[in-house]
From Swiss-Prot:
Taxonomic placement: Bacteria, Bacillati, Bacillota, Bacilli, Lactobacillales
Catalytic activity line of the entry: 3'-dephospho-CoA + ATP = 2'-(5''-triphospho-alpha-D-ribosyl)-3'-dephospho-CoA + adenine
Keyword ATP-binding attached: yes
Membership in a protein family: Belongs to the CitG/MdcB family.
InterPro entries noted in UniProt: CitG (IPR002736), TriPribosyl-deP-CoA_syn_CitG (IPR017551)
Protein name: Probable 2-(5''-triphosphoribosyl)-3'-dephosphocoenzyme-A synthase
Pfam families: CitG
ATP-binding listed as a keyword: yes
Gene Ontology BP term (one): prosthetic group biosynthetic process
EC number: 2.4.2.52
NCBIfam families: citrate_citG (TIGR03125)
Source species, domain of life: Bacteria
């Protein structure tokens, strides 16, 4: 019974990734219609990546459940080691293309925290589907406790390094903390912004319209390291401003799709891709599935 419940939740994480890549049109991003601003990956590359990551999603939640009583830092280290193996497997499946590196990191922590939370709240194991807003907050607080050290440990001593990873370079140049920052703050972008917005949207609109509006909303608020890496601070600010204007227009579903298709070409021309917003879109879907919003 326990393994079946954990498996079903790990499959919700996979489903969240599938929903994210399938949602179309998404400006600058890979979707069912085109490859956005990416010339090195396609919809099928994402499918290959997700299949490679899927067994690790199961391992993340089982690890959290099995080691729920461990100190948060020890659980984090277990999850990170698993995550690094998952990353290697992903890169092998995609022939070196980075489809889900940051999202895999976030999912490792959230699935691990979900497993640990389930071990402490056994009623959810027998009545799956009763996840509440409070449960979501508790899971994110667990992630925060696991990652309280993360910024200092990973980014606090970069002055001694000569070569930087993509995420480290963003921090050194712009102070952007990326997925590490989201995790160490308890995913407040999700709990304080994305999920409240989506709960409201899904109560008023059909699922696909709600998902598209959520994407626009995230693009209007997220500190998007991918956009900044590709186009700099001004390009990122420009995208945020454009999306705020789009939200204010309150377009019909048909007109929203047309506007997003047009903006997709705009971002393709500038080689801009809001990958940070896309990752948070998938994470929002994960909790939306847990809370039965979708």
């Amino acid at each position: 019974m326990t393994k079946a419940v954990l498996t079903s939740i790990s499959q919700l994480a996979l489903k969240a990734l599938l929903y994210e890549v399938s949602l179309s049109p998404k400006p600058g991003l890979v979707d069912r219609f085109d490859n956005g601003a990416h010339d090195d990956m396609s919809f099928m590359t994402f499918i290959d990546s997700m299949i490679a990551l899927s067994p690790f999603f199961q391992a993340y939640i089982e690890t959290g459940f099995a080691y729920a009583k461990e100190e948060p830092l020890l659980l984090f280290n277990r999850l990170r080691q698993l995550g690094q193996k998952a990353e290697e497997t992903m890169f092998c499946a995609t022939q070196g293309i980075n489809t889900h590196k940051g999202l895999n990191f976030s999912m490792a922590l959230l699935l691990g925290a979900t497993g640990a939370y389930l071990a402490r709240t056994p009623h959810l194991m027998t009545d799956l589907g009763c996840f509440s807003k409070e449960d979501t907050l508790a899971i994110c607080r667990l992630v925060k406790s696991m990652t309280a050290h993360l910024i200092q440990t990973d980014l606090g001593h970069l002055n001694t390094k000569k070569e930087f990873t993509y995420g480290e370079q963003l921090f050194v140049t712009y102070g952007i903390k990326g997925p590490r920052g989201e995790a160490s703050e308890g995913f407040t972008t999700l709990t304080d912004h994305a999920l409240p917005y989506f709960r409201q949207m899904i109560s008023q609109n059909d699922p696909e319209t709600s998902q598209l509006r959520l994407l626009v909303y995230l693009m209007s608020i997220v500190e998007d390291g991918n956009l900044i890496h590709r186009g700099g601070i001004e390009a990122w600010k420009g995208v945020k401003a454009d999306m705020r204007l789009l939200l204010q227009q309150d377009l019909s579903t048909t007109d929203l799709r047309l506007a997003l298709s047009s903006y997709n070409q705009c971002l393709i021309n500038q080689h801009l891709s809001p990958g940070g917003a896309a990752d948070l879109l998938a994470l929002t879907f994960y909790f939306a599935f847990l809370e039965k919003l979708l």
